[in-house]
Regions:
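Membrane-embedded and juxtamembrane structural elements of multi-pass membrane proteins
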Residues: 1-202
Length: 202
């Protein structure tokens, strides 16, 4: 008489490699998820907005209280901004559009998702943002805008929703930007500055 022998297979052991990979993928998912959610929120700002298309960019004037920003070829502003301030704000954001800063920002956000554990990536992202803002400020002042009026306009634009993935006005950069403008320091092209940060990320 034959008897069947039941052999139980041991459950695979949890290895350090598996744990590290799981944690890494969770981090990638969280950072990428935040980026995608920001894109969704940006798209929603078009609802009920007055949209004006030009050869250089699309101006989206939304009833929602936001801090002005640009995302690729679209410039988003609050529709209650005074006309005297709107021109300088649009000039600033149009500079971001012309220099394709959004493409740089998206590339950096993807790098942050892939290398979220590396603090130098987050530092490089901050430096890139600074370089882009300095470059846009330099372009606006080169067009002949009054520096004092422009600085006041920037200060009044600090409040409201402004996604990290987009190019916008942020409080943390205000003092540095004001100092840069008053010393008339010229910024180099932001792509070159970004390339200079890459060796620190490897």
């Amino acid at each position: 008489e034959w008897t069947a022998e039941v052999v139980e297979e041991a459950a695979p052991a949890v290895t350090p490699e598996t744990v590290c990979l799981t944690v890494y993928l969770i981090g990638v998912g969280l950072v990428a998820g935040v980026m995608l959610w920001q894109v969704v929120r940006i798209r929603r700002l078009r609802r009920g907005a007055a949209i004006t298309r030009t050869e250089r960019f699309t101006l989206v004037r939304t009833p929602q209280r936001i801090a002005s920003f640009s995302f690729f070829r679209s410039i988003y502003v609050w529709d209650q901004i005074p006309a005297g301030e709107l021109q300088a704000i649009v000039a600033h954001e149009a500079s971001h559009v012309a220099h394709r800063h959004s493409a740089e920002r998206v590339a950096m956000e993807c790098m942050k998702a892939a290398l979220w554990w590396n603090p130098f990536v987050w530092l490089a992202a901050r430096r890139l943002t600074e370089a882009e803002e300095f470059e846009a400020d330099s372009d606006v002042l080169a067009e002949g805008y009054d520096i004092e009026h422009y600085m006041k306009t920037i200060f009044r634009q600090l409040f409201g929703y402004s996604p990290e993935i987009a190019n916008g006005l942020r409080d943390s950069l205000t003092k540095k930007r004001f100092k840069m403008m008053t010393t008339q320091t010229k910024s180099r092209h932001s792509l070159l500055r970004l390339a200079g940060t890459l060796p620190a990320l490897i």
